[in-house]
A protein has these predicted regions:
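Noncatalytic, beta-rich nucleic-acid-contacting surfaces in large DNA/RNA-processing enzymes
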Residues: 1-239
Length: 239
């Protein structure tokens, strides 16, 4: 698991804090919307912070300026091929909510938390359920087909999404009052996105580790960096 070494670093940093200050930190009970920690991410000075150490991520965090853990989760999800194309739109919507445009009213409750952008696989499932009347099972099958790039399945489901499938109990977008061109546009965006998308639970698990490392670095930099450097030194080749 990618974060396994980082979990060890966090555990050792907590031990260092206990040793140096007599403070018993419970990382599950820290404030996960501490503005000082979030502001530190927005500076781009994120060396040693899980998932945010690359030059590209540092630059993205400076643009994003996360104000909540939700922003961190979305940021980790967006910084990937495919979803990365939505980054300018996401940042614009975050900073200027008046610029957000929803292709149809049904999208607003699904995409409002992510500033009008599709960010998670779960949102694709919600869209096809809300706009076209897909069942939960059918929407999950479509999500899998998109992630595996099964073009024949995606094209078949496009017909059901836009025009419906009466025999299978799918009303479709047009029957639900959504324009045909708009429905096809939404479907195209879902295909482009879903090929590379994270599910939210996966991104959230990473973001929690990201935040914990940022919290420790901000409040206990000596103890955290000592734990981090020790973890690196033990993996270096011995001569």
């Amino acid at each position: 698991f990618l974060g396994l070494r980082t979990l060890t670093v966090i555990n050792n940093a907590v031990k260092n804090v206990k040793k140096n200050y007599g403070i018993s930190l419970d990382m599950q009970k820290i404030d996960y919307n501490d503005q000082k920690v979030l502001d530190s991410l927005g500076t781009g000075r994120t060396d040693g912070v899980f998932q945010l150490e690359s030059g590209g991520m540092k630059g993205f965090m400076k643009e994003l300026k996360p104000h909540s853990l939700e922003d961190v989760i979305a940021g980790i999800s967006l910084y990937r091929p495919g979803p990365m194309d939505f980054i300018p739109q996401y940042i614009r919507g975050k900073n200027r909510p008046d610029t957000i445009h929803y292709d149809c009213p049904q999208l607003e409750p699904i995409l409002k938390a992510t500033h009008g952008c599709i960010v998670y696989q779960e949102q694709v499932m919600q869209i096809v359920q809300s706009l076209a009347g897909f069942t939960l099972g059918r929407s999950d099958l479509l999500r899998r087909a998109m992630s595996k790039k099964k073009l024949n399945v995606m094209e078949k489901e496009r017909q059901a999404f836009v025009y419906g499938n009466e025999a299978e109990g799918v009303p479709g977008c047009i029957k639900n009052g959504i324009d045909e061109k708009i429905a096809n546009k939404i479907y195209d965006e879902m295909i482009d996105f879903a090929q590379y998308a994270f599910n939210k639970s996966h991104a959230a698990a990473y973001a929690y580790v990201t935040y914990q490392t940022a919290f420790l670095k901000y409040y206990y930099p000596v103890e955290y960096m000592a734990a981090l450097m020790t973890s690196v030194s033990t993996s270096l080749p011995r001569f």
